[in-house]
Swiss-Prot record:
Cofactor note: Binds 2 magnesium or manganese ions per subunit.
Source organism of this protein record: Mycobacterium leprae (strain TN)
Catalysis performed (reactions): 2 D-alanine + ATP = D-alanyl-D-alanine + ADP + phosphate + H(+)
Cofactor entry: Mg(2+); Mn(2+)
Pathway: Cell wall biogenesis; peptidoglycan biosynthesis
GO molecular function: ATP binding; D-alanine-D-alanine ligase activity; metal ion binding
Gene name in the database record: ddl
Name the UniProt record assigns to this protein: D-alanine--D-alanine ligase
Length: 384
């Protein structure tokens, strides 16, 4: 008679600490950025307080229980990290609330039976950027499964992901915005009146994307068709925004376990060495592969400007009914701050602004992450 033995999985935690599943990767074109963020979070979660489980999602959507080694989720020789089916053990998270928090094996062989509960978790940290993660999809799954999770709920995640509806909610609250036009899938280009209203230059973006993927700066209308086609490689809905001449500022927002909300110091992004180039902007390569971005934290702005930015950041957070955390991006113009966008799950990579903003606000990285987890547990799940 063969006796079943669980395969050796040394990364599975034990003990009485809060068990956190860091979920990363995913089907969006921000897969690699999510992996980088997860590596940074895995490195900085306080292991005295938390047991940590790493769950990677492949680009095809397969969930894998992986080794929570942050070194495996780093850029190596300019190669971005990714989750593969060889990364660990295939699993699922059941939506049945009677099995809340269970990670269930889907694998066969090597002594492992499909349907076996690999481990159970107390809270999920969904470090997913872009569609199929940051847009309310995984938040809906976790609500069905009654598993607490870090970050915004279904509505705020969906609204924050879609630039059109973010802007509509901000406009309803009277927040300062730039001019824009939305091109839905059946609209090939702008009307003449829209071109006149926006004027050049404009930025053409996927409406539901991040990390500056798929974005083009258009300085002549002849460039518009190719810019729209490029954006539509990532999203059939495209947004065209009037360029704003101003400094790029960012501010972090953090919800505490008691429900109060705080804003961080203000930071500024400058693209090094290309300040005289009209076509330069803070794109994906600048953010993650090249050392071309300079981050001033805190930003060199007057106190009254910083206070206004922090106040607007909290207003933006509340305008979409956000929870947990967010980063709000601004342009500082001669007439004051203009909101660019809100990120309901900002980047946590080694170069990301969000943890840097809180570090200069006297909240170190482990404390920042612990606050997010504590807030998720205090909030729970369900209508609130």
């Amino acid at each position: 008679m063969n006796v079943y033995q669980r395969p050796l999985m040394p990364w599975l935690p034990s003990g009485g600490r809060v068990r956190v599943a860091v979920v990363f990767g995913g089907r969006s074109n921000e897969h690699a950025v999510s992996c980088l963020s997860a590596g940074s979070i895995l490195r900085n979660l306080d292991r005295q307080r938390f047991d940590v489980v790493a769950v990677g999602i492949t680009p095809e959507g397969t969930w894998m229980l992986t080794d929570p080694n942050p070194d495996a989720l780093a850029i190596a020789n300019r190669q971005l990290p990714a989750v593969s089916c060889e990364s660990g053990i295939e699993l699922t998270l059941p939506a049945d609330p009677r099995r809340s928090g269970q990670l269930v094996s889907l694998s066969h062989g090597a002594g492992l039976g499909a349907g076996e509960v690999l481990t159970s978790v107390d809270v999920v940290f969904p470090v997913l950027h872009g569609p199929y993660g940051e847009d309310g999809t995984i938040q809906g799954l976790l609500e069905l499964a009654r598993v607490p999770y870090v970050g915004a709920g279904v509505l705020a995640s969906a609204a924050g992901m879609d630039k059109e509806f973010t802007k509509k909610l901000f406009a309803a609250e009277g927040l300062p915005l730039s001019a824009y036009t939305v091109l839905r899938p059946l609209r090939p280009t702008l009307h003449r009146q829209e071109c006149e209203r926006l004027s050049l230059p404009v930025f053409v973006k996927p409406a539901r994307g991040g990390s500056s993927i798929g974005i083009s700066r258009v300085s002549s209308w002849g460039q518009l068709p190719s810019a729209i086609a490029y954006a539509r490689r990532h999203d059939p809905k495209v947004i065209v925004e009037a360029a704003v001449n101003g400094r790029e500022l960012e501010c972090g927002v953090l919800e505490m376990p008691d429900g109060t909300v705080a804003a961080s110091a203000v930071g500024e992004i400058r693209v090094a060495g290309v300040s005289g180039s009209e076509d330069s902007f803070y794109d994906f390569t600048t953010k993650y592969l090249d050392d071309a971005a300079e981050l001033d934290v805190p930003a060199k702005v007057d106190d009254d400007v910083a206070d206004e930015v922090r106040q607007l950041a909290i207003q933006a957070f509340r305008a979409i009914d956000c929870q947990g955390l967010a980063r709000v991006d601004f342009f500082l113009t001669d007439d004051g701050p203009v909101i660019n966008e809100i990120n309901t799950m900002p980047g946590f990579t080694m170069t990301s602004m969000y943890p840097k903003l809180w570090a200069v606000s006297s909240v170190d990285y482990p404390t920042l992450l612990a606050t997010m987890v504590d807030t998720a547990l205090a909030r729970g799940v369900g209508m609130r």
